[in-house]
Amino acid sequence: SLGNPEKGLAIIGEGNTSALLPDGTYFLKASGFELASIDENGFVRMYLDKVLELLEKNDITEKELKVLFEKAKHDPLDKRRPSVEALLHAICLSYEGIKFVGHTHPVFINSLTCAASFPKNLQGRMYPDEIVLLGVDSVYVRYTDPGVPLAKELKNQIDAFIRKYGAIPKSM
């Protein structure tokens, strides 16, 4: 449903989803599958702790990343490749109470985030309903290359948010 083109939540099928399982693994949308048409065969099962080990790496090549992702698969014979955002999902799922991540690129939000004034416009809430739906504030991450750099920056921003507000953010 997140990938339904009529909803405008995922430009050109981009975006990813993940779901945490009780055993410390998670399902993640595999590379090459679109949100609009994905079914149960479009997900790869990953070990959360093994993916989170990437946070300890500083400079990692794309080739090394692929090897580490292969080692983090629940089924080493699974030919599906995890999304480049596997670490971003693992980070989000590692926080207390988070069981599902819907990482989308909504058309209406992208039109706002591409504006030079966006960071300033994001500050503060105007309406009580906005606070209920989006929280007291949002996590804002400046454009960063996808993969490990984006995941690490997102973790830094989430942790800063938690220190400031004492809760995990509702919107990023």
Label every model-predicted segment.
Residues 1-172:
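Glycine-rich flexible loops
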